Design a protein with these regions (language model features):
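Iron-associated oxidoreductase/ferritin-like identity signal
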Residues: 1-187
Length: 187
């Protein structure tokens, strides 16, 4: 039978070895997982999409307010603020990776200012594009074991899916009641 001091010493050595093994696994994962160029590129794409949406939606809210559609302007302004938050989440994650995410590519909107249907369709298309990029980012991040990025993207994806529902419901309402009646409700 071994003395207690010797047993405690052996147990301490085993625990120390386990801790060292776990630390080396974590360090290896950190080096591998946080250098995925695919995840970083997808985050940049997501940032660009959300920044484009922020810019377009803010302009739309200003136009709608000026045209007297205060209810619709409030919804669009709220959506613009949400998209701005999504862009900020992407920036925070890209900053974590210490990567250059400039310049952002923001192109002019493709909707005509006074064409309400084109504006809503444009918003729907851009939200669908955001959802696609967010899904791809989640998949790519999980493939390399980057659960932090994947988990960060889930609320963004949920927000985009809510946006899809919103703009699809607007198009459905317009189809059912006509554009003039829809706009009358937005005053």
């Amino acid at each position: 039978m071994k003395p207690i001091a010797e047993l405690l010493n052996e147990q301490e050595q085993e625990i120390t070895q386990e801790i060292k093994t776990e630390q080396s696994v974590v360090e290896a994962q950190t080096v591998e997982n946080y250098s995925s160029s695919q995840v970083i590129e997808l985050l940049k794409q997501s940032l660009n999409v959300h920044w484009q949406q922020t810019t377009s939606l803010t302009a739309q809210a200003v136009h709608l307010e000026r045209w007297g559609y205060k209810k619709l302007a409030a919804v669009i302004r709220e959506d613009a603020e949400e998209e701005h938050q999504h862009a900020m989440e992407n920036i925070k994650r890209l900053e974590f990776f210490d990567t250059d995410y400039q310049p952002l590519t923001v192109s002019p909107p493709v909707w005509t200012r006074h064409d309400m249907l084109a504006m809503i369709r444009y918003n729907l298309d851009s939200v669908k594009q955001a959802a696609e990029v967010e899904k791809a980012t989640i998949v790519a991040a999980r493939m390399v074991g980057d659960e932090l990025t994947a988990n960060m993207m889930i609320p963004l994806l949920q927000g985009s899916e809510n946006g899809i529902k919103l703009y699809e419901s607007y198009l459905k309402l317009i189809e059912q009641m006509g554009l003039d009646n829809f706009l009358t409700l937005q005053v």
